[in-house]
Amino acid sequence: MSDALSTPQVALPAQRPTPFLTLSLGSIGVVYGDIGTSPLYALKESLNAATAGNALTEAMVLGVMSLMLWTLVIIVTLKYVLLIMRADNHGEGGTLTLMALLQHVMHRRFAAISLLGMAGAALFYGDAIITPAISVLSAVEGLKLVAPVFDPYILPLSMAILIGLFVVQFRGTAAVAAWFGPIMLLWFTVMALGGIMNLITDLSVLRAINPLYGVDFLMHHGRAGLLALGAVFLTVTGAEALYADMGHFSRRPIQFAWFAVVFPALALCYLGQGAMLMSHPERLENPFFFLFPEWALLPMVGLATAATIIASQAVISGAYSLTQQAIQLGLLPRMEIRRTSETEKGQIYIPRANWLLLIAVLYLVFAFKSSSALASAYGIAVTGTMVITSVMAYFVMRKCWKWSVATSALIIAPFLTVDLIFLMANMLKIFEGGWIPLVIGGGLMGVMITWRRGTKIVAKKTVRDEVDLGDFIKSISVSSSISRVRGVAVFLTGNPNSTPTSLMHNLKHNKVLHEKNVILRVVTEDVPRVPEAERSSVEVVNDLFSRIELRFGYMESPNVPKALAACADRGFSFDIMSTSFFLSRRVIRPAVPSEMPRWQSLLFANMAKWADDASLYFRIPTGRAVEVGMQINV
């Protein structure tokens, strides 16, 4: 509970916590969308890889089914639901959250942890691009079973659905999000019923619960077995979302939803598909939709399309959230971030990220044309992210939880081994499309490394030319040659002990000083959100100058005017109409010689050029902002 709720002078209505079951239902609609739509294609692709063009056998079905069930148990249930979700940063999860959590305890090794965090984030974007494409395609492909005449329209219809999904993102999801949970609950219920109807016709498929069937399959199928194992991983491609979206619903509701609804429904659906294929191997073309009677095909295609849109929405929202975190942590340049809800903190829209995602998703749909072809590109990015999560979780156990080396290694080693086996299996698909998420991830990793390195060089060069603030205030306070003007001037700076460049330029060119001057520093903390009671600190230096520090979490969008207005109880009176904000706008030019390679300095210069203005990012009204330009060679 926030400190604001316990402050006696503020009369607020009592706020009841969101009911546990409501949170669980919400998590079914958001967190489990990706993993919940995997039955549309996972078993089909796994068995196609296992057969390698040969006839489907009972041993193949039982072996692959066993691998799928135990993958759900080991990776999702044991690793994520019961272990990894304990490694939260004030309720938030994800690789960048782990990076922030380790920042103050790793010290000398933090550079390596930063690289791991950036790699995990970059690979997530590869997943965010593939998930909408493969999910929507696999749902719409069900129309072929309704009537073959629909076949030519599957690709354009899928692209139309995806375009519509991305175009309406600016409206936010507040109006329809309440339906996500009930629709996905219906999806899991119908999916489980379809599985049960087929499972009762051949209960012998329950033998797949024995893990020895999976081991035997891998031992006797060589390369085809490894390819099938890579496809089996499609059953858990949404597992990382459980951890990344933890902040929206908290750990226990997500865990309850998994054990009460999602896991039983997935297991029953996969077992039902397996039972059906043991009797009707010819239905491998699309085993999910064959679970249902012919009269139910069209409604199921409609429900599947709705479920895949919801799953895609969850991944898109996750990409926005990750982009915001990366910006706040200094890994990406500033971009416009719009809030789409007045009440829900996590609902944001980032236009630039949205359109880049849409272009990439449409390219994948157009290039691969079917969910089966696209499945070869799926999995590598997620397995890479899971390996990184396991490694970082080990350091959390050691450094944050203070567990011994032996205990930490004993717990993480089995999970890391499984992750590495799946990574190796998925590496076999590199030349069939698996290179795409790796190229996307590698490119984004290069962008983040370049931006972080470039901003450090800029900061170092800026500090070198700055004047100590204490000395400056002493000299300017006794100077009689500087004119005073009415109002308040706020000078943004990254170093509160140095005189802001914008202040020096204002004095040099305008020869004036405001009657009240604020040296403002905006800090991003290593926590998701900063309580309002800890948002600001005010230090009055003398009659002319004050220092203010505003603190925001890496999940927050900084609103500087609003935060300054809240400083009234700390003795700072703020009126936006009598305040001018002075910001330094740095023009980056590639230097020769440079501290970075030529390509990197050119990339950094272009990224800086396309970064959003600080006034927009900090929500400073355009009419109150004064930008002072300066050139820096990097």
UniProtKB/Swiss-Prot annotation:
Name of this chain's protein: Probable potassium transport system protein Kup 1
Membrane disposition: Multi-pass membrane protein
Organism phylogeny: Bacteria, Pseudomonadati, Pseudomonadota, Alphaproteobacteria, Hyphomicrobiales
Function: Transport of potassium into the cell. Likely operates as a K(+):H(+) symporter.
GO cellular component, one term: plasma membrane
Transmembrane annotation, as ranges: 20-40, 64-84, 110-130, 148-168, 176-196, 224-244, 256-276, 290-310, 348-368, 377-397, 405-425, 430-450
Domain of life: Bacteria
Cell compartment(s), UniProt: Cell inner membrane
Matches recorded under PANTHER family: LOW AFFINITY POTASSIUM TRANSPORT SYSTEM PROTEIN KUP, OSMOTIC STRESS POTASSIUM TRANSPORTER
GO molecular function: potassium ion transmembrane transporter activity; symporter activity
Organism: Rhodopseudomonas palustris (strain BisB5)
Catalytically driven reaction(s): K(+)(in) + H(+)(in) = K(+)(out) + H(+)(out)
Alphabetized UniProt keyword annotations: Cell inner membrane, Cell membrane, Ion transport, Membrane, Potassium, Potassium transport, Symport, Transmembrane, Transmembrane helix, Transport
Family: Belongs to the HAK/KUP transporter (TC 2.A.72) family.
InterPro entries for this protein: K+_transporter, K_trans_C, K_trans_N, Kup
